[in-house]
Swiss-Prot record:
Organism per entry: Bacillus mycoides (strain KBAB4)
Name recorded for this polypeptide: Sulfate adenylyltransferase
Keywords associated with the record: ATP-binding, Nucleotide-binding, Nucleotidyltransferase, Transferase
Similarity annotation: Belongs to the sulfate adenylyltransferase family.
One GO BP: sulfate assimilation
Superkingdom of origin: Bacteria
The protein's annotated pathway: Sulfur metabolism; hydrogen sulfide biosynthesis; sulfite from sulfate: step 1/3
Catalysed reactions, as listed in the record: sulfate + ATP + H(+) = adenosine 5'-phosphosulfate + diphosphate
EC assignment: 2.7.7.4
Origin organism lineage: Bacteria, Bacillati, Bacillota, Bacilli, Bacillales
Length: 378
């Protein structure tokens, strides 16, 4: 495994698979992980974690060689499938009848899922979407290096779906020496816009990198969100300072640990800085408001390879008549309009139109149209 910021490349569409007999049916999460492992999005990982690295990541947020890595990237299989596999063999990775890759099996092991839940998600509560998914997936893990033998054909956002090598190239083309990454699974409301633009004041470019893999069922669908990002960037951001590209991973909802993971992945995509806001990658009340920022104190910027930028909760202040945070505004709670993606979602679902202090009107229009479409298809 490479520890420098070299990109791993495990794509080989000419790899000979015709004589490989065994196969593993992989789920959507493993499929998106397979792609990100192969394209270098998860560098320095070269495959699904073996037991030694898995234990190390779960317990110490580092790989066995000491490199920082906070989320276990695993390939779960059923006991029935595991019985037919052995270390040292190559097995095809299949989803919906298509062979997408190969795993070179290094080891097969049974994880302690309760321990994984407790240490990675800080809870064993099955109401937590990450924990629920962890328990739903099969109980045996297969570790080993992978090879991606087929690129995905039915990509919903082809013009925004770029590999790390391509985003790095784009940033270079634009002459950006410093790039700040922003992770989101929500439409961008005014608080996000304020944070992004504050960060943009100190770097050359903003990489808006929405997650479009598997999310909770009540999250706003990716196609609606993408349209909302397009109208926002078109109307309110300087075109030569912002770049939109999707992050095809599944959402883990692992709060602090996922914040580290999101930063490491954005480094691979070419970012030098990464925005960490309040309750980054959180869900419900499982994590403290700024826990995802505090976790970064356990690591140096050198070992992360990317500089985190921390932002406090921002709001619209009716007295300042502007977006602000507690760092910049002296007024009391009664003057603050607190904005959140959850609140915007709630208002839209109840047929209310969020005020312009919450969200840009162009964004609201896209969301209302998208939700109407959703209701019709349900």
């Amino acid at each position: 495994m490479s520890t420098t910021n070299e990109l791993v490349n495990r794509i080989d569409e000419t790899y000979e698979i015709s004589n490989i007999v065994k196969e593993i049916e992989i789920d959507k999460i493993a499929l998106s992980d397979l792609e990100l492992l192969a394209t270098g999005g998860y560098s320095p990982l070269t495959g699904f974690l073996g037991k030694r690295d898995y234990d190390s990541v779960v317990e110490t947020l580092r790989l066995a060689n000491g490199s920082v890595w906070s989320i276990p990237i695993t390939l779960p299989v059923t006991e029935e499938v595991a019985e037919k596999l052995q270390a040292g063999e190559e097995v095809k990775l299949v989803n919906a009848g298509n062979v997408y890759g190969v795993i070179q099996i290094e080891d097969i092991f049974v994880p302690d899922k309760e321990k994984e839940a407790l240490l990675v998600y800080k809870t064993t509560d099955e109401a937590h979407p990450g924990v629920k998914k962890l328990y739903e997936r099969p109980n045996v893990y297969v570790g080993g290096a992978i090879i991606l033998t087929k690129r995905f054909g039915n990509n919903p956002f082809p013009s925004y779906h770029l590999d790390p090598i391509e985003t790095r190239e784009e940033f270079k083309k634009r002459g950006w020496k410093t790039v700040v990454g922003f992770q989101t699974r929500n439409p961008v409301h005014r608080a996000h816009e304020y944070i992004q633009k504050s960060a943009l004041e100190i770097v050359d470019g903003l990489f808006l990198n929405p997650l479009v893999g598997e999310t909770k069922s009540d999250d706003i669908p990716a196609d609606v969100r993408m349209e909302s990002y397009e109208v926002l960037l078109q109307n309110y951001y300087p075109k030569d300072r912002v770049f939109l590209g999707v992050f095809p991973a599944a959402m883990r909802y692992a709060g602090p640990r996922e914040a580290i993971f999101h930063a490491l992945v954005r480094k691979n995509f070419g970012c030098t800085h990464f925005i960490v806001g309040r309750d980054h990658a959180g869900v419900g009340d499982y994590y403290g408001t700024y826990e995802a920022q505090e976790i970064f104190t356990n690591f140096t910027v050198e070992e992360l390879g990317i500089t985190p930028l921390f932002f406090e909760h921002s709001f619209y202040c009716t007295k300042c008549e502007a977006m602000a945070s507690t760092k910049t505004c002296p007024h009391g709670k009664e003057d603050r309009v607190i904005l959140s993606g959850t609140k915007v979602r709630e208002m839209l679902r109840n047929g209310e139109i969020p005020p312009s202090t919450f969200s840009r009107k162009e964004v609201v229009e896209v969301l209302i149209k998208g939700l109407k479409k959703e209701v019709v298809t349900e």
